[in-house]
């Protein structure tokens, strides 16, 4: 199993960041790697089990299922239902935590997956998507960001 994990400090309070992230169907509004997002399952976008289809900015698509969401802990997890990448058993989570006095936040985004083709390109694609997501989130909030790990 391959793992990717990036933690960033974003100069915005946790509640502001969580308000953006928790809207499972709005990723295309802030992630520059996503051109379009629709919820397919007929469930509320912020309910466990809902499925979103992402049309990626560079072409292709991914269908993702929201596995869990905890508004008190400010974290959620999701998995891939279908992807054009040579990736299986994809599970990811995003967690928001207060940093310092609470005016800044730590955002940890991690993914675990198997690659059907052991080409390192797929690890790089997932890494780039997560890093671009961290950067896009900070940009949406007009906040500075530093990746720390």
Predicted regions mapped to residue ranges:
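A structural signal for short, well-ordered beta-strand segments
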Residues: 6-8, 94, 109-111
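Hydrophobic ligand-binding cavity/cleft-lining segments
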Residues: 1-41
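Short, solvent-exposed linear patches
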Residues: 47-48
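Hydrophobic-ligand binding "helix-grip"
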Residues: 29, 56-104, 112, 143-147
């Amino acid at each position: 199993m391959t793992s990717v994990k990036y933690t960033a400090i974003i100069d915005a309070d946790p509640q502001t960041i969580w308000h953006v992230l928790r809207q499972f169907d709005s990723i295309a509004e802030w992630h520059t790697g996503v051109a379009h997002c629709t919820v397919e399952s007929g469930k509320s976008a912020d309910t466990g089990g809902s499925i979103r289809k992402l049309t990626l900015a560079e072409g292709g698509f991914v269908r993702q299922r929201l596995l869990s969401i905890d508004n008190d802990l400010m974290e959620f997890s999701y998995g891939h239902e279908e992807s054009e990448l040579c990736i299986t058993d994809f599970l990811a989570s995003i967690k928001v935590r207060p940093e310092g006095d609470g005016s800044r936040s730590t955002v940890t985004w991690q993914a675990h997956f198997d690659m059907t083709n052991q080409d390192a390109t797929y690890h790089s694609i997932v890494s780039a998507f997560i890093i671009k997501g961290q950067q896009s989130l900070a940009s949406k909030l007009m906040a500075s960001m530093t990746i720390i790990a």
